């Protein structure tokens, strides 16, 4: 199975012609790449993985205290078997926790579980992920994207989300922990899962392995960025499968960079980020 390319974070920050050419070549094929030597401390990642495991080990009645009503899963806990990929009838085999931005008072406030020690530690990871994602977005400005706003600005005070995911042991007749889907947002960053299984589909319809080591971050383009770039940057279908490890839980920590809700993604139709997200939440059974 083919794999995805990798690039140094320092080159993304530099954003020179060679880096842009490298990214354009690969993003047109698979839309995923690995970021090496990023500034996110390994200790921070390990702390949040440990926190995530402790959180999902809580009894269900405790976790359900943090299922926020009428928020469409924007913050807090979402139970196993709720989110369903577009055009699918079988729900993904996962439960998750959403942490949003604290910088925009117009967004829903985060919730913090009383049962956990230092529940605010994930706010620190959120901010560090956000900085890295904005650096990637700034690099994409060099793609000569025809967009009527500053690409670097649209995510400031945006509706971004840090997601802690737990994929329990899978059912023997269902190898898909997360069925094939694309991400709704601008850019997704993902620290490597504790088990393999993430695959992306290239332009030839082949599934490409998207594993990386624990010191690297996987980055992919989301649907909103494809719209903003008028198709220059391609959002990619991907999935999570159980590769012979269905008897073990899998934990994952993706960060989804979103624009502000009022940002217009497509000036031809005046489609806003909020409109697009609202429709997607309906499509995946979260609204």
Regions from the PLM with identified roles:
Residues 1-287:
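Peripheral, non-catalytic segments flanking oxidoreductase cores
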